[in-house]
């Protein structure tokens, strides 16, 4: 009886302590100046557990400043920093370096021409440590460490992100870029299924688009992927939807074609310890490795198919469908025109008419508009006729459009190119950035099938885009939706905004930005207050944006990114990441945290605290009484 009393009293103390510590830990994550921050010895233990792949991060430009100045290395970094492939491999760099700077004046470590006037290098938004993982076990170790010490955890693959989601100050980064395995399957068999699913490829989290294109071409395949060769295949691109500029018309979104994910979960469970050996000890174990497909963990599979990267777990591998690498004819129609509203609008309407007409014939393409100067714009429309080998046939089909354009514009160009394999169009070599030392910001808006395919749809969209204030260096381009993207709405279920199944074009707007705190702030203000209202006004009742390239200050992100899918996504977020280890800017559940994912905010956090605490208490009661009896 006395033993029972002491056990109950001990349990009460334990429960009280759990509630108290859970409350303390759930408000803000641990910061370097706080006693909770891991000691050097604890960081070294993590390093050993990960086979010495943990590194202490500094911005790549740090070698150019006094405390660690190395002139030769500085020159090398300045030269290599323009190589997108090199940046992808560097955990202390981002592709869009406007997000490397912090929020306070001077909290940056600029490189190149932006160094003028800067005498010190500051950390900015570059995480303090990076787990440069080589295996799923390394990912598990990093997850366990971040959970145990209540650290901000960031997932980075190649650093491509226009909203700053690949970095955060005072964080531990998991750098997935070394997970480079690629395996092709002639007829893939998924876990839990008796049937097979045809040709597919399994891709590690660090594989870049250009590398996958090259390997796929060697095997006679193409994949639904993006245009940039250094974007990671499996990370935010795939989990955010994955749009191919012209192949989505034929094969749907990339996320429509994913068959299975391998995931290290964010939740770290409290295991039931052995009643004899471990009574009195409750230890956290590593994040579980799970498979998610239509049969195994189907709710997680649904969430990962459009719910956004770095949110529900750390994806370490994905298996996707591949398609035959067919021949094609690429036909390019171009003009150089004035920014005069009437002339510009008429040219755009002609381009959109070509897109409208050829999309109905299952021919996809992309319009790219580059602002050359204050008075000059260059526009090129590239259409892809799949399974075609005769340029004369394509030229004949394009001739009426060329003649229509010549009635509007003086400077018109046209050419057609035969591609023995469609993969020849894909860029497989990393981009080399220009010499302007600028980053970029941008956003997107989708155009509905109802508007675009109306009789006056092309003219209406063109007139709306012509209203957009631009400056030299700005870029506007389309991504072709419709076709199989729309048909897939009846064939499969993803967590994408349902309105994607009624979208025919995605308008992308990108602006070069001086990578300073002031430059970023001014550009963000213009993007949110001027450009996005004008873009949304083109199709105001549709109001759909692409989360992978969205306004970093989007206030209504739940609705414009996910719509009616959001409620279920939030429910699954609380199931698979109950304590909010993975918070992505403008991602599912991020409204419960501050802008950097450091501190919980608002009433919902208290509700989560109660749910989490009760769940932990229930498990503690179960384990304790098992030991007592």
UniProtKB/Swiss-Prot annotation:
This is FAD-linked oxidoreductase ifgC. Keywords: Alkaloid metabolism, FAD, Flavoprotein, Glycoprotein, Oxidoreductase, Signal. The keyword Oxidoreductase applies. Residues 1-30 form the signal peptide. Its cofactor is FAD. One of its GO terms (biological process) is indole alkaloid biosynthetic process. InterPro entries: BBE, FAD-bd_PCMH, FAD-bd_PCMH-like_sf, FAD-bd_PCMH_sub2, FAD-linked_Oxidoreductase, Oxid_FAD_bind_N. The lineage of its organism: Eukaryota, Fungi, Dikarya, Ascomycota, Pezizomycotina. It is an enzyme of class 1 (oxidoreductase). SUPFAM superfamilies: FAD-binding/transporter-associated domain-like (SSF56176).
